[in-house]
Amino acid sequence: MSTSSFERSSNPTLSQWQRLLKNAGTWQGSFAQISPVGEFLSEVRTEVELTPSDEGKAMHQEVRRYPADAPPQVQILDYRSLNRATLFFENGAFSQGSMQWGPFSSFGAELGLIAGDRRLRLVQLFEKNELRPLTLIRERKQGTEAPERPALSLSALVGTWKGKAVTQYADLRPDTYSDTQLTVEQIGPTQIRQTIRLGADSPPLSSTGQIEGSQILFKEGMQPVQ
């Protein structure tokens, strides 16, 4: 499992639990349902509260949903450990989901990014081999004025993006790091080309995508990607 980051922590020896604690606080935002083709379906206001207790050895978690036409819904969790299906990165970013997948079962994952007083999470679920509606969760810490970023446009995506890739392993061996570079070019009214470099010694990987509404479809490989 990998994630890209522009900052590396000064303390890469934090335990998984210590990395979880970087998410402590009350996060206010919304759960938005988006169709597999990028169409907005619905949105509900939410609060997620993560409160450490017992000198940081336990976590109390409350998820509060506020539907427009129904009473508030509250889910409460208390835990002292993390399962193997959840992995946290140095800055508090995380991934959790199914340890195995297959074409005849239900599976999915939640990907969470954190930057200062903002969090962005995405839940992807598959029913057998079909992608279900996505859940996009945009949050900011209670009491802050972290601005909402505008919706991503194609013109904002075009360019060269440099960063660091952090790879984490399920057996909890040390994280590995490599430089990354992604170049996105628009090569026609409805086409883009992306070129990815992972490390200085790796050959570039290029693919061409077709722009269709809110989607960019990459159909060249054995596994289509959007």
Regions found by a protein language model. Give the residues of each.
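Surface-exposed beta-loop interaction hotspot
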Residues: Q124-Q168, V184
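Phosphate/adenylate-binding glycine loop and adjacent helical scaffold
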Residues: A109-Q124
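Central antiparallel beta-sheet cores of small beta-barrel/beta-sandwich binding domains
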Residues: P52-S106, D171-Q226
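N-terminal helix-cap/turn-to-beta initiation motif at the start of protein domains
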Residues: S9-T26, E145-T160
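Beta-strand-enriched cores of mature, soluble protein domains
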Residues: G29-F31, V44-T51, T180
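Preference for intrinsically disordered or flexible, low-complexity segments
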Residues: G116-R118, E127-E130, I137, Y177, ...
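Amphipathic hydrophobic-ligand
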Residues: E39-R45, P103-S105
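Tryptophan-anchored aromatic micro-motifs
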Residues: K22-P36, L154-D171
